[in-house]
A protein has these predicted regions:
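Membrane-interfacial alpha-helical segments at the cytosolic side of multi-pass membrane proteins
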Residues: 9, 46-58, 146-156
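Membrane-embedded alpha-helical transmembrane segments of multi-pass integral membrane proteins
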Residues: 15-22, 48-51, 76-86, 144-151
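Non-cytosolic membrane-interface motifs at loop->transmembrane helix junctions
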Residues: 32-43, 68-69, 99-102
Length: 160
């Protein structure tokens, strides 16, 4: 495996690991409970980490497999970027989110209201969890996903 490709894979793996480690530390040590969307924003990092580990074991001379892995890196980064933008838009009230995540009431009777309350997550997706009273975790995720997307697109473009 060439050195640049190896570093590229390790950057993806390290970024995924560090971001997941950070959110779990925030969740379990600083009691910053994630909303439903925050939990789903972690999925691309799991996938990128798994792809990086798989890529470590693929011979870099297998061009088709390496290309497929690179495209999967880009697709996963792009999905994570779009989902993070969607979440930030909900937090900043640019648009409304799903009713089960934003606390909107759609119940018409007492039984439906009771069922909705029992199924509503405690943490609302439309309320930003701010770090240092400045930037939300979802906004930081947009930055992280943007950087990973740029890295993955650059590596594919340069055919490394």
């Amino acid at each position: 495996m060439n050195i640049i490709l190896n570093k590229y894979i390790l950057v993806n793996l390290a970024a995924s690991f560090l971001i997941l480690l950070t959110v779990y530390i925030l969740q379990y040590f600083f009691n910053m409970a994630p909303c439903d969307m925050c939990i789903k924003e972690r999925y691309p990092y799991y996938i990128i980490g798994i792809l990086a580990v798989i890529n470590i074991f693929i011979d870099s001379h297998q061009i088709l497999k390496t290309l497929i892995i690179k495209l999967l890196f880009i697709a996963t980064s792009f999905f994570g970027f779009l989902y993070s933008i969607y979440h930030v838009g909900i937090e900043r009230k640019f648009w409304t989110g799903r009713t089960e995540c934003s606390g909107q009431n759609t119940a018409l009777d007492i039984e439906a209201l009771s069922a909705q309350l029992m199924n509503t997550p405690i943490i609302r997706c439309d309320e930003a969890t701010l770090l240092f009273n400045l930037i939300s975790i979802a906004e930081l995720n947009v930055v992280a996903m943007t950087l990973l997307l740029i890295l993955n697109a650059f590596v594919l473009y340069k055919k490394i």
